[in-house]
Amino acid sequence: MNQTIHRVSPISMSISELTTLLSSGVSVFEIFAGLLVVHLIYQRIRTRVKVYLLDFTCYRAPDSNRVPMSTLIETIYLDDKLDQESIDFQARILERSWLSNQTSIPRSLMEIPLKKSLSSVKIETMTTIFTSVEDLLRKNKLSPRSIDILITNCSLHSPSPSLSAMVINKFHMRSNIKSFNLSGMGCAAGILSVNLANDLLQAHRGSLALIVSTEALNTHWYIGKDRSMLLTNCLFRMGAAAVLMSSNDHDRDNAKYELLHVVRKNKAKDDRAYRCIYQDIDSDEKQGVSITKDVISVAGDMLKMNLTSLGPLVLPYLEQFQYVIQHILCKKLKIYESNSSYTPNFKTAFEHFCIHTGGRAVIQAMEMNLKLTKVDIEPSKMTLHRFGNTSSSSIWYALSYLEAKRRMKKGDRVLQIAFGSGFKCNSAVWRCIRKVEPNTENKWLDFIDSYPVDVPDSTNIRPG
């Protein structure tokens, strides 16, 4: 038999129940006072808990890890495992990559021959993670034992014990800390971690969460000849970020941003999307991460999917109305050609954009699809130029750039958007709740006055 389930408010009461209470000697005032208390408790429970971004830091490698283009191309030329065709291919990619001579890689990858080992990757991850966390805790005068939730993410290095356990061990965190380690989630894992932290902070009100995002280059540095796998060597560089979030109302005055929305989209059910970024072995049994030519078109599809869900949450009603009308005219009445369909103006919803620095093609595609200006893409373009593709932490380098430039004002809204293997497209929306001034821990501060710089579309780095 079908039964209808009725949802009732916790403060609802029938006439008979009220009569029973009154006849038992309870006053009307006491009844309504009790109902008011229950109502306030209910409202507090059901009301969305506000989650704040207190602070974050990015990792900046020492100059000894700097890899100028000339050094990198020389290392490639001296690698006897590569043929001339593979060497020329990497040189062409590097020349058009927008990367500068200031990006960094682990010391183990500068040796000839390259030194790939478990001990090397452990040194790399400990260096980036520990330095980022130490900087963040020192900057905010926090004890490691004050952290309630810990989330680490690193796509291609998943040791046992986990990276989160490594952090707990290093900083002697509490035994009851809620810790999570995410692996294999690609460059979109930074926002994914924010989403997980948000859910946990909503459930555990008043808690403090620490997110650490990084990638291990030593693990996936490719030493074969497959072109699709050589791309990662050309684009990925050393980096990490540590992020501090809170759901404690008392932290609002010290917070920089409030989290408004997180939208996550995944297309792993589609084989083409699933395999466009794929860890595999080549014909010579060499392990690497393959990036196929489908990645740009898949990313474009995923971007549309994400923005379709994000739009109604952030766009002004007029902008949404214009989109609906144009969509009807385009699809139903066929007045417009399909390639001239209306694209909502997301600049009406955001003052700033932090795009994942997946590469030159990713940033240019975002610029075209969202009709962004050179100023809009400047934080991501300069991040790619100065630090390279630092994977899941790249969106924090871009936000750090905006802070160093003193562009973040109270009330400003910023969109962080990232793509990752799977295939995923994740976005996070933050609102600045006070004017943000850069401090001494900002890794851009020493040279921010020289930015933005003119980034040539192509440079010649090949000898001879």
UniProtKB/Swiss-Prot annotation:
Which pathway does the database say it acts in? Answer: Lipid metabolism; fatty acid biosynthesis
Q: Does the keyword Acyltransferase apply?
A: yes
What EC number(s) would the UniProt record show? 2.3.1.199
Q: Which Gene3D superfamilies match?
A: 3.40.47.10
Give the annotated active site. 187, 352, 356, 385, 389
- List keywords of the entry alphabetically: Acyltransferase, Membrane, Transferase, Transmembrane, Transmembrane helix
Q: In which tissues is it expressed?
A: Expressed in flowers.
> SUPFAM superfamilies recorded for this chain?
Thiolase-like (SSF53901)
Top-level EC class as recorded in UniProt: transferase
UniProt cross-references to InterPro entries, sorted A to Z: 3-ktacl-CoA_syn, ACP_syn_III_C, FAE1_typ3_polyketide_synth, Thiolase-like
Q: Give GO MF terms, alphabetically.
A: fatty acid elongase activity
Q: Name one Pfam family in it.
A: ACP_syn_III_C
Coarse class of the protein's main subcellular location: membrane
* UniProt KW Magnesium keyword: no
Query: Which GO CC terms are listed, alphabetically?
Result: membrane
User: Which residue ranges does the record assign to the FAE domain?
Assistant: 42-333
Listed under catalytic activity are: a very-long-chain acyl-CoA + malonyl-CoA + H(+) = a very-long-chain 3-oxoacyl-CoA + CO2 + CoA
Membrane disposition: Single-pass membrane protein
Tell me which PANTHER family the record gives: 3-KETOACYL-COA SYNTHASE
Report the family membership.
Belongs to the thiolase-like superfamily. Chalcone/stilbene synthases family.
Name of the protein in its database record: Probable 3-ketoacyl-CoA synthase 21
Q: Which organism is it from?
A: Arabidopsis thaliana (Mouse-ear cress)
